[in-house]
């Protein structure tokens, strides 16, 4: 399939969607599958009695008591740390991964990620005490930090610009598939006593092995090769992934971008310059907003949440499987729409969509779920339905676009550093939500859904006023085509920086 990459201000680069690029995309995106599996598995394991008896006996005792506060049964800081420690480690690892991405390349960084994943899987599945369990989660976090740094950059840099949105969302698609697989594994291993939780935690080893050996088959990105002065290799790589002979214009554009990037000795300091503020601010706030939609609170703790509203253990795990299935299907919708309707439309539509769902869930719980007892069956089913509809809206918008937009808007000279900051922000806010959600649920009860509703209003307004459309724009032409025409961000495009654009046009 051939496409011509063009926009009003950018050159046109001919490219084909080759089989080889598709294979590279699918192998790299396995990193997203592991991330999704780790998101989904922790909530289901946290609801398993064998796991709770082994590591969190106080929570297990509370869970058995019918008259225990519905909203507080699982409120335990160490139980929350089991989930959240992964994201704390990922936060730190993403900065190290930024350096390896720049110095060694995107492919070796993915290989490091797979090794960390395998170590983490061994420690968590074989854990004999809480310390060993948490250390294993930390190693998984190192893998997440390296994988989430390298994979979206890799996908953005090998994709033709007109297909970049859809191909980049494959990462988020694999995250959702990982969550679904984890939910299915949780459902079946919950009945395997007393070591079902070990099987569930050990399952992440399979995609980690696939990523480790699959990464040996994929090509390094042309941008990464040229950035490290391997110009001839970069040119051959570009010809291979584009599937056309005439790649000289795009090659020269990448070389020029790399020349400019090489003049930046401190990319993190460069991020603080006025011209870097638009992608920097948007990249950070997208990570904040993505987490404060409340999505990971639901995905982490879906089985726990469904037990809270009255489902039994098996029914709660099955409901999580249904939610995960909706998540996957809706992500396919996002892949189809993102390069057709654009990024802004999806962000704005889903903000209204998710707000309505959160309000309805909050109202039902406030009205019908007391401190003890359970919801009636009809109300519980309505909650599950609106959780699914809510997940649907997130899956085709803020989920994938929270990764896509930062990966495509930073210029090359700050791309690795800027995306490292974005990944770190994502991991930090994910850590905050994972560590605090069960305590917030205990303290705020149904009010937690109104809390997230308030955040959805804020992020919808931010998207309306401050996030420009980037559909179809070449990745190294964002400054000229996106930021300079924007009503607000153009104030940061100072005249002294215009030599960048003049040199680029001359090249």
Curated annotation (Swiss-Prot):
The chain crosses the membrane at residues 21-41, 78-98, 115-135, 138-158, 165-185, 199-219, 280-300, 318-338, 345-365, 381-401, 418-438, 447-467. This is Sugar transport protein 6. It comes from the Eukaryota. It comes from Arabidopsis thaliana (Mouse-ear cress). SUPFAM superfamilies: MFS general substrate transporter (SSF103473). One of its GO terms (cellular component) is membrane. Pollen specific. GO terms for biological process: carbohydrate transmembrane transport. The keyword Ribonucleoprotein does not apply. InterPro entries: MFS_dom, MFS_STP/MST-like_plant, MFS_sugar_transport-like, MFS_trans_sf, STP/PLT_plant, Sugar/inositol_transpt, Sugar_transporter_CS. The keyword Transport applies. Mediates an active uptake of hexoses, probably by sugar/hydrogen symport. Can transport glucose, 3-O-methylglucose, mannose, fructose and galactose, and, to a lower extent, xylose and ribulose. Its main location: membrane. Inhibited by uncouplers such as 2,4-dinitrophenol and carbonyl cyanide-m-chlorophenyl-hydrazone. It is a multi-pass membrane protein. One of its GO terms (molecular function) is monosaccharide transmembrane transporter activity.
């Amino acid at each position: 399939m051939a496409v011509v990459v063009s926009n009003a201000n950018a050159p046109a680069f001919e490219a084909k969607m080759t089989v080889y690029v598709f294979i590279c995309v699918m192998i790299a995106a396995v990193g997203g599958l592991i991330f999704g599996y780790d998101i989904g598995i922790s909530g289901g394991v946290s609801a398993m009695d064998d796991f709770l008896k082994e590591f969190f006996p106080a929570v297990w005792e509370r869970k058995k008591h019918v008259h225990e506060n519905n909203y507080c049964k699982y409120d335990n800081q160490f139980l929350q740390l089991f989930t959240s420690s992964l994201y704390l480690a990922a936060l730190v690892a993403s900065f190290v991964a930024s350096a390896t991405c720049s110095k060694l390349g995107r492919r070796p960084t993915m290989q490091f990620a797979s090794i960390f994943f395998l170590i983490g899987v061994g420690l968590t599945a074989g854990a004999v005490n809480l310390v060993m369990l948490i250390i294993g989660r930390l190693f998984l976090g190192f893998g997440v930090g390296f994988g989430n740094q390298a994979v979206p950059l890799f996908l953005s840099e090998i994709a033709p610009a007109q297909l970049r949105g859809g191909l980049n969302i494959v990462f988020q698609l694999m995250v959702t598939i990982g969550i679904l697989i984890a939910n299915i594994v949780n459902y079946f291993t919950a009945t395997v006593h007393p070591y079902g939780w070990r099987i569930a935690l050990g399952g992440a080893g399979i995609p980690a092995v696939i990523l480790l050996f699959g990464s040996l088959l994929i090509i390094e990105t042309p941008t990464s090769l040229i950035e490290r002065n391997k110009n001839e290799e970069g040119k051959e790589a570009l010809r291979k992934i584009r599937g056309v002979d005439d790649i000289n214009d795009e090659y020269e554009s990448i070389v020029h971008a790399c020349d400019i990037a090489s003049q930046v000795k401190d990319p993190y300091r460069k991020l603080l310059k006025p011209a870097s503020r638009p992608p920097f601010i948007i990249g950070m706030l997208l990570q904040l907003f993505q987490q404060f939609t409340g999505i990971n609170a639901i995905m982490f703790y879906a089985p726990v949440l469904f037990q809270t509203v009255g489902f039994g253990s098996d029914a709660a795990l099955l409901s999580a499987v249904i939610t995960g299935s909706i998540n996957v299907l809706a992500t396919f919708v996002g892949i189809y729409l993102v390069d057709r309707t654009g990024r802004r439309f999806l962000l704005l539509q889903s903000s209204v969509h998710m707000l309505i769902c959160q309000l309805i869930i909050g109202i039902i719980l406030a009205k019908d779920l007391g401190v003890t007892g359970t919801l009636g069956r009809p109300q519980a089913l309505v909650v599950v339905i609106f959780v699914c509809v809510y997940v649907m809206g997130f899956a085709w918008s803020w989920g994938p676009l929270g990764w896509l937009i930062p990966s495509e808007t930073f210029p090359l000279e700050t791309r690795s550093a800027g995306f490292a900051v974005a990944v770190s922000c994502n991991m930090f806010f994910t850590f905050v939500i994972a560590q605090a959600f069960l305590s917030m649920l205990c303290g705020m009860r149904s009010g937690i859904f109104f809390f997230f509703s308030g955040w959805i209003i804020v992020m919808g307004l931010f998207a309306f006023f401050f996030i420009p459309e980037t559909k179809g724009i070449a990745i190294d032409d964002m400054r000229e085509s996106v930021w300079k025409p924007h009503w607000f961000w153009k104030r940061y495009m100072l005249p002294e920086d215009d030599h960048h654009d003049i040199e680029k046009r001359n090249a």
